């Protein structure tokens, strides 16, 4: 779990706020995506840190850590990427990835638009611990036919999970250097040195400090609201149970049970 009491000037790259700030620079995000996905990217639009999507006021929304699109020569979207720094195993991360895909797709298609207009979507979670418990450092998922895994569903959605504490188990050096930096905060490549320089710059920037304080207040408010909703739900459940118990007792007293 993230420690919100870490002094601002010591915030590491694994802090959600710091991660979003640093990876909102496309010169940081592009080589990272190319390295961990093994692809070449034509051009990235400026990444959007803490991008929020809400389909309607009553449905659950989503806030992406960093959301970015690859564009072609005419500015058209080729692929989209959601990059998440996830320090806590909430036991629901795979289902969160499913929800993120649904929210992203619902925002992408306008009413009446063809499904074929959906582009490749990569959802990337960077975690300290192995949330699947299978001992791997990298998990890559896509939809395949159960009886014949050579047949791909072709929905163009890919969900990858990178376990940075297991960086020593990663064969690909391009991926390992990033995971090692997330685990140790020690840069060992030109790309991670660029990240580290930005981290240190943000740690000393007063405007970023103010922005972080506002962000932390919003997080605290959201946590309090979620806690209140949980308390209200528990209270309603207890009240319903009390009414049911009372009704059952009445029936027993009347000899109908």
Q: PLM features: what roles do these ranges have?
A:
Residues 1-157:
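Accessory alpha/beta interaction modules
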Residues 2-7, 69-77, 81-86, 172-257:
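Short, charged alpha-helical interaction segments and adjacent helix-coil junctions
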Residues 20-24, 165-169, 183-186:
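Generic amphipathic alpha-helical segments used as scaffolds and interaction surfaces in large
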Residues 125, 162-163:
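Short, conserved beta-strand edge motifs with alternating hydrophobic and charged residues
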Residues 156, 163-174:
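Extended serine/threonine-enriched, polar tracts that run as long, contiguous segments within proteins
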